[in-house]
Amino acid sequence: MIKKILGMFIPIITCITLSAQDYVMFQSQYLELRNGEHSALQAGVLKHNKKYHGGSNGPKAYLWYVHTGPNAGQYNWALGPVKFSHMDKALSAAHIKDWENNVSKYARSHGHTFMIRDENLTYNPQNEIVGENILVKRFKVKQGSPIHVQELEKAIGSIADVLRKTNAKIARRVYKTAFRQKVGELQLVYPFSSWERFEDGTQGLPADFWESYEKINGRGSQQKNVGDIIEKHSNGITNEVMTMVK
């Protein structure tokens, strides 16, 4: 129960250099305000994070404000990178009480999840640590057959392949749910430095990306390899633009 209270998302949203045995995982959750007290919640979360999740004696915690998507107006709190073994350590009574006083007093937590980064699908040339501003594209995987996630991964992988071949000046991290759920999910995380990134309409990818994609894969490949696959094997995409609260 307590571990669920302090569970988190995004994802996911931090990256480190991996060894062959290592993995990058984030535990996260959304925080929905109870009475619209933005400043109180922000101050409370930052206070709690500094005291218990500063990164010196364990994983670091981060807070983002969600600007777009189904959870717009809420916050996303993520801890990571974490290992499964971190969950073996019980939280102290003081830790739990501090969370209750500084966070759950102002917000309801929901959407707890563990997300693991897929290195084969990820393109992260600069090995960024944390994206202060990020676009999170969520793919809801259709259920009923493993072919749905396999085909989506193939489509997402074809994009990563072109990003590598063109030495793209962006990053795109891909995460998958660590535990099987009723509705599986793939998350594509694009860090950005300015909202101007969205003016060309590509929403994360380089402005000339699809031109390069079809040059490499053939005319009509964008629709065939990506568009049709997403339509057939997913239940839609949501786009969440988040900015870090510091």
Question: What residue ranges belong to the model's regions?
Answer:
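Short S/T/G/P-rich N-terminal loop/turn motif that feeds into the first structured element of a domain
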Residues: 20-246
